[in-house]
């Protein structure tokens, strides 16, 4: 006898992070900044005090309180998770019946569709326009006409870096009866959050993370914020001890220090501006087709040389992310990293241009 895998398991397509060791990593939208020496010393002291023989606080009270204080939301409306991915999985498995339809947009974070394959829910996908904008009227009409139960999207968007303004998001929430899962992983880089309004809606869950602006990707710490009813359901549905004690303590330390973000945010935004302006210059020179507006810590570039550029950079120890044959996503790094990636790409494309006209 042998175990026969079900079709769902056979057809799973896992998330495909870039593997290998590279000198410059601009592929995962991580922060290029590390905590200061004093911050690291404080973190070390906290780790020394962790009771490793005890299970963590199941509701991460101190962590949720720190998040609530920083962002001005009631901690009772916050659910902590082992990264936002865990919370997406909990949301899908909890709020969807078998057969319920999920709506996504494209391009967007690929894991949304992955989780629909796990829960075996039909998934509709609407394409964004040439400017990588969501057609709000189309979204609302599709939810109504197709009986969509859950609509999930990132704002600002990963991978396009384009954001949808607050009023447009409000329309989707107010004019439909679907559960709206609003992934604000990159909202620390923009100013259109709906966190301050979340308690007013019975069909909204907002996701946030410590991995981007806060630079704590290694901790795997995310949050779901919703009204009291939805939060009670999320807390009941998640695993009992889902966020380990080290993550709870260290993330709470960072969230409790407003100076941490106040110091790092201008540096990250300056890096993003430098990188975007560099690609805008390449666009003006006719070397890339388009660089999209950015509300995140990365830039999204359209070029028919995407595959060649990625390989050219790899050969020089630099890794970026490619989407299909025509798009690149480049994380903002240090000034030196930004300058190097811009110089290498410009060198390659100018050389090709010269060769064509030789």
Where in this protein do the model-derived segments appear?
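Conserved beta-loop-alpha segment that forms the PLP phosphate-binding cup at the N-terminus of a helix
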Residues: 60-61, 75-99, 222
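PLP-dependent aminotransferase class I/II
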Residues: 36, 203-281, 291
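Conserved PLP-binding catalytic core of the aspartate aminotransferase-like
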Residues: 269, 282-316, 332
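Conserved N-terminal alpha-helix of the aminotransferase class I/II PLP-enzyme fold
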Residues: 41, 45-83, 271-274
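N-terminal "arm"/small-domain region of PLP-dependent enzymes with the aminotransferase-like
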Residues: 1-54, 147
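Active-site phosphate-binding strand-loop segment of PLP-dependent enzymes
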Residues: 130-188
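PLP-dependent enzyme catalytic core of the Aspartate aminotransferase-like
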Residues: 167, 307, 312-316, 321-358
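PLP-dependent aminotransferase-like
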Residues: 5, 94-153
